[in-house]
Amino acid sequence: MPLLDPDTRSPAESSAAQPQRLPFPPVTYSHILHCSYHHWQPRYRTLTPKSRAIPLTPSFVSYLRADGIVLPPETTRPQGDDDLDTFSDDGADEESDPSVEWQEIHSQIKSTISEFGGKVTPKLNWSAPKDAVWMSATNDLQCRTPNDIYLLLKSSDFITHDLEHPFDGCVPDTDDSSEAPATQPDIPYHLVLRKYVNFNPSLEFRCFVRNRVLLCMCQRDQNHFDFLFSLRDTLRSRIQAFFDEKLKDTFPDPNFVFDVYIPEPHQRVWLIDINPWADRTDPLLFSWLEILQMKDPIGIKEEDADGPEESFVRLSLNGANPTVVEVNGDEDCESEEEDVGSADDGDDLPFLPEFRLVKRDDPEAYSFSTPQYSAHKLPREVVDASLSGPGGMSEFLGKWQDILAKQTQEDTDSDDGR
């Protein structure tokens, strides 16, 4: 998701002097690798949706890096004899089949698709090709064949970033025992195939952890969902308990960002992804400057989520006179900041991790008509030419140059006639 300008989301920040560089701690090579799916998923296997991670060979990685989109020929042929003449017998398809270099991976992909009921969603170590879903017939990450997967992977800028720039802005891990200049570690690339599930995007949330403290969280989808406000305290309690029990003391790094999905009846939390604590990770409804300057929550929550009424206790540390405020969890509060302030206007410290939702009147809400990742899209003519292989792209470029030359000539003739 494209990063938003912090000034557009935090007017209070725009009036203050902002540092030219966000005050992130150094992002190390190991932190990026710890956030790779192949590293963290085995540890949290029971917390994640069903998936398979297929180790990739250098030849397959080279295929993903190569220019153009050349797909293996489909192996399913028509049943009728009348259609057999549509297939060439001269071996041209076999010669242009890129999968001959990685037949084992091709076979694993096909068997995994079959194992997962015929539909999967793909990603590499860190990213899913969400910016390329416009290439899909279903306009989502649903893939039914290996070629569906290859098309998404090779059309995605996010995948290109995983392949070419995974350690941008990173520093080597400190090692006082070695004075040799550190080199970037090798990356064991994996193709992750997750069983396709039609997730409800309104129930996906991004959570930010600093120094092993759950700092804040927000919805991932940037549309307004009115029902979320009455569920906010319940969902926050679920996420906090999940973090405390499963992630707080088990993830290798103290700072990270994780995504969860909490489907109805909102009893179970699924771990979807773990992301680096770095500006490459989209802060969504926050700004990174806001998160980095945020104070740790100090509240203690006591909640019976299964009871008829939910409540929690806020401990307000205000000089020598601590106060206790009980808040009804059923209140439909659109602005959590206003709710906190009403409990104790003089308290500067947050009681609980802030849970930010898109408000009804938020200018970013109701973005159903705005195509997501539209900056990554290409004209259909370019896509069609790339699907035809190197020859198709060369032909397209030749036609494009002819069009430009003709346009230049017309402009010149028009100027001469004046």
Curated annotation (Swiss-Prot):
UniProt GO molecular function: ATP binding; magnesium ion binding; protein folding chaperone
Chief subcellular location: cytoplasm
A GO biological-process term: eukaryotic translation initiation factor 2 complex assembly
Residues annotated for Mg(2+) binding in this entry: 273, 275
Residue ranges, annotated region (Disordered): 1-23, 71-101
UniProt biased composition (Acidic residues): 81-98
Keywords from the named record: ATP-binding, Chaperone, Cytoplasm, Magnesium, Metal-binding, Nucleotide-binding
Any one annotated GO CC term: cytoplasm
Sequence positions that bind ATP: 123, 126, 128, 130, 194-195, 204, 206, 220, 259, 273, 275
Highest taxon listed in the record's lineage: Eukaryota
Compartment annotation: Cytoplasm
Translocase among keywords: no
A Pfam family of this chain: D123
Bias type Basic and acidic residues, positions: 1-10
Role this protein plays: ATP-dependent protein-folding chaperone for the eIF2 complex. Binds to the gamma subunit of the eIF2 complex which allows the subunit to assemble with the alpha and beta subunits.
Family: Belongs to the CDC123 family.
Protein name: Translation initiation factor eIF2 assembly protein
The organism of origin for this protein: Neosartorya fischeri (strain ATCC 1020 / DSM 3700 / CBS 544.65 / FGSC A1164 / JCM 1740 / NRRL 181 / WB 181) (Aspergillus fischerianus)
